[in-house]
């Protein structure tokens, strides 16, 4: 997301050369759709992380329903953006803005897939060892949610500065992922009776890392 925003840094419209028309409304509508999709994704990711902490499988249907809404939102953004390109035949700067919007929507959809994968892995884990905590994974998930929120704010405000701050947070989350991975490897070696559970936790940590890469 942040790479798309930084890449469009030079796409600032020259108002002296561009008359405000319904086309501006199209651009604003696409932006609104992306923000709404981002809010859905934040909700889904939060629910997936809560599932890790609470292991309340009653949340599963909600997560899957949100995934459907996210997929539908991505399709709507892609189709509306494509139609706008066809109708308006935008100039270079606006053309890049629309292409960036399509890329961001696709990225958000992929992050949503990771959130659903996390929920599925929790479901597969079935039994949670009561004497072990998943605080490191939970903290990693919270950090990913925070980064996602910051990236969406950067997009909403068209702020290159905020997008660079997201990049700085990446390094901190990478360290947390490494810590989380090492902790669960140690637990796996110490308690091979629950190796299936810890294996799922390692996969979940990987899903969170992949989400971070997309952000």
PLM features: residue spans?
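Generic structural signal for well-ordered, non-transmembrane alpha-helical segments
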Residues: 35, 39-42, 64, 68-75, ...
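Single conserved hydrophobic/aromatic residue that forms the stacking wall/gate
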Residues: 1-12, 214
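Hydrophobic/aromatic-rich structural module bridging two neighboring secondary-structure elements via a short loop
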Residues: 80-105
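Leu/Val/Ala/Ile-rich N-terminal alpha-helices, chiefly Sec-type signal peptides and the beginnings
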Residues: 15-68, 77
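Long, non-coiled-coil amphipathic alpha-helical linker/lever segments
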Residues: 45-48, 52, 144-155
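Long amphipathic all-alpha helical oligomerization modules
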Residues: 84, 89, 162-211
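A cross-kingdom feature marking solvent-exposed beta-strand/loop segments within repeated
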Residues: 87-94, 127-137, 189-196
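A structural feature that tracks compact, well-ordered secondary-structure segments
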Residues: 103-124, 151-154, 163-167, 174-177, ...
